[in-house]
A protein has these predicted regions:
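Inter-helical turn/loop segments and adjacent helix faces that build the functional surface
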Residues: 69, 170-181, 240-252, 305-313
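CBM-like carbohydrate-recognition segments
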Residues: 24-56, 68-78, 84-104, 108, ...
């Protein structure tokens, strides 16, 4: 109980800090970024800027905003930015694989987003090029990636962020399970060589050959702990864990590394300001200063680690205090009504020409600027995490389970060539998926889960919410799993004990309804096997519905709901939304539990992610409204 109270207190404390003039700081900073860099990181008119990791940091922040707001301008910006470089055949302009520069892999994550959302092969082909680079990247003797071909035998902390999150996400896409050993080893090698046992911090770089002038002749390590290098490393860990298999034997090692990293980060957080210094362990060093990008990265890593349960809730203190310090020290309003980020060191590295010796004095010589892309991107990521942390958490400690037994379609994934489950799945980011609706639950503190087996008392016991959508016909699946009396009884007993059942059917011809409705009939809700709200082409108003004074949909006022099965009610079932004589949405209390039913899958990405519907339709608000209501009902047991 104390832990939950602590989490809530931190979230509330963060809430007023995230706003300036009524608008979220994450959105204001994104507006600044999209204005400064309209389609690439071109800062001088007529001058082409090369494929650069800086842009990838910004685009990941923009993607985080798109996922939280469903505002299409964010997706359009990501696509426009990458299309500036990616040709129709997947060639990446200005990219040279033969450089074996691991920085160049970073933007692959934005390409993966575009492929997953659009299915366009040019993005997949570009990703395959970056994947090929990783497979051919020169390595240390034990297998660690060189940072660049021009920096032989060297591993830098920066490189873990530039390469590993893409490596993990692409490996997950193509089902290359063996790759995860290699991914984990990159972090293990880096920590084994670069972690200082006394401070817990990691040195910026390690030279296996010990030939560099900056390298210690015994250890091969650079002399100092650079803030942003540790920031890259921390962000890499939380991003890789998103795709690292839950049952992989090396996942515990990554979690342990993350927790050791956050412990060191917490130790060197300035207690007065909540910020971190350019050189982390020399708070009293002459000329040392609080640095913005590192501070943003640590806030992002800590907040996300806690949200995703990669680290204990106590680490949220790092993020809450750091975010307050960032706003006080580095955020300033600009003439456009948005904000700027001050205080980011433009660059720091090791070796090269002119030679960078890694000394304390060197790190303090590099220029500090306003609105550096790396800092801006890290701030958007950090602010987005804090925006999520500030949301109410009715789902805390609850599990929302999505059925994949009655809805069990498969297709051949082009990237892997393997059969993959699809259509209304949490992980799908294309039109067919529930990615955005899944966020509606996780942002509110719930865990999401998928049940591939038939429902039983045992496998439903761990779920607070059970969602069944669009039961298969023989047209969709060779051997459909139909609803049976034993399943009806099992589910009904689970609801009676306090479960929340969400039934999202479909209209006649697009779902199996004859057997499926034996389940809903148990609760007094019958799917009529008809088809209402037929829509022709892009005449979206044909599917428009107005919502007023609705106990479930408290913020959505106009929604799009097409080709639906209407409902007939009996017993205690109540209509939630009607039009004319037709019942479109219904609910019923059953024992200690609740049932919600509508004759359409409704909240799949196509109609909630902002890319298709006109802006006056509020399906994303409706999806959030339903998620909040469902989670609230699950607490009323």
């Amino acid at each position: 109980m104390k832990k939950n109270i602590l989490n809530i207190a931190f979230a509330i404390a963060a809430l007023p800090l995230t706003h300036v003039s009524g608008q979220l700081l994450s959105e204001k900073m994104a507006s600044t970024a999209m204005s400064l860099w309209k389609d690439s990181l071109v800062t001088t008119p007529g001058r082409m800027v090369k494929w650069s990791y800086d842009q990838g940091v910004i685009l990941e922040g923009i993607d985080a905003l798109w996922q939280r707001t469903a505002d299409r301008k964010y997706f359009d910006y990501i696509k426009r930015s990458m299309d500036h470089y990616v040709e129709g055949d997947g060639t990446i302009r200005t990219y040279k694989q033969e450089d074996y520069n691991i920085d160049n892999v970073k933007n692959g994550r934005s390409l993966l987003t575009l492929y997953k959302v659009t299915g366009q092969q040019k993005y997949l082909k570009a990703c395959a090029t970056l994947w090929q680079q990783l497979h051919n990247q020169p390595r240390t003797r034990e297998g660690g990636f060189w940072h660049k071909k021009i920096y032989p035998y060297q591993m830098w902390l920066d490189g873990l962020y530039m390469g590993e999150p893409f490596y993990a996400e692409y490996a997950d896409l193509i089902k290359d399970d063996k790759a995860f050993d290699d991914i984990a080893n990159q972090f293990i090698y880096m920590e084994n060589h670069a972690r200082d046992k006394k401070t817990g911090l990691l040195y910026h770089g390690w030279d296996e050959s010990k030939e560099q002038k900056w390298a210690d002749k015994t250890t091969g390590l650079s002399p100092n702990f650079w803030g942003r290098a540790m920031g890259w490393y921390a962000m890499a860990l939380v991003d890789v864990l998103d795709y690292f298999p839950a049952g992989h034997p090396k996942r515990p090692a990554l979690l342990a590394i993350l927790n050791r990293t956050l412990t060191a980060v917490q130790k060197y957080q300035d207690p007065a300001s909540g910020l971190w210094f350019q050189v982390l362990d020399k708070a009293d060093g002459k000329g040392n200063y609080h640095e913005a990008s590192a501070s943003c990265m640590f806030v992002y890593a800590a907040a996300k680690a806690v949200r995703k349960e990669y680290a204990p809730a106590a680490f949220f203190r790092i993020a809450q205090k750091g975010y307050a310090g960032i706003q006080k020290a580095f955020i300033e309003p600009n003439d456009s009504g948005w904000v700027n980020l001050k205080g980011t060191v433009s660059v720091a590295g090791l070796g090269g020409n002119p030679y960078r010796d890694g000394s304390y004095e060197y790190y303090l010589r590099e220029k500090v600027i306003t609105n550096d892309a790396k800092g801006v991107g890290a701030f958007i990521l950090a602010a987005s995490e804090m925006d999520i942390a500030a949301m109410a958490k009715p789902g805390k400690g609850k599990t929302v389970t999505l059925d994949s037994y009655f809805n069990n379609e498969f297709y051949t994934e082009p990237a892997s060539g393997a059969q993959a489950s699809y259509h209304y799945k949490w992980e799908e980011r294309d039109n067919n998926g529930f990615h955005f609706w899944g966020n509606s639950y996780t942002y509110r503190g719930a865990r999401i889960n998928t049940l591939y087996d038939a429902p039983t008392s045992a496998n439903l016991k761990k779920s607070d919410v059970y969602i069944i959508v669009d039961a298969d016909t023989e047209k969709e699946t060779k051997n459909p799993n139909y609803m049976k009396p034993e399943y009806v009884n099992t589910i009904a007993e689970w609801v009676k004990a306090g479960g929340v059942l969400v039934l999202l059917a479909n209209d006649a011809g697009n779902a199996e309804l004859k057997q499926f409705t034996t389940l809903s009939d148990k609760f007094g809700i019958h799917f009529n096997e008809d088809s209402r709200n037929k829509v022709t082409g892009s005449q979206f108003e044909m599917g428009a519905l107005k919502i007023e004074n609705n106990p479930i949909f408290k913020t959505a006022r106009k929604v799009y709901l097409k080709e639906i099965s209407t409902l007939t009610l009996s017993g205690n079932a109540k209509a939630n939304l009607t039009e004319g004589k037709d019942v479109l949405i219904a609910t019923v209390k059953y024992g200690k539990g609740t049932v919600f039913a509508v004759g359409d899958p409704w909240f799949y990405n196509e109609y909630v992610d902002g890319r298709k519907l006109p802006a006056d339709f509020e399906n994303y608000k409706a999806a959030n409204d339903l998620a909040a209501w469902v989670l609230e009902q699950s607490s009323k047991k």
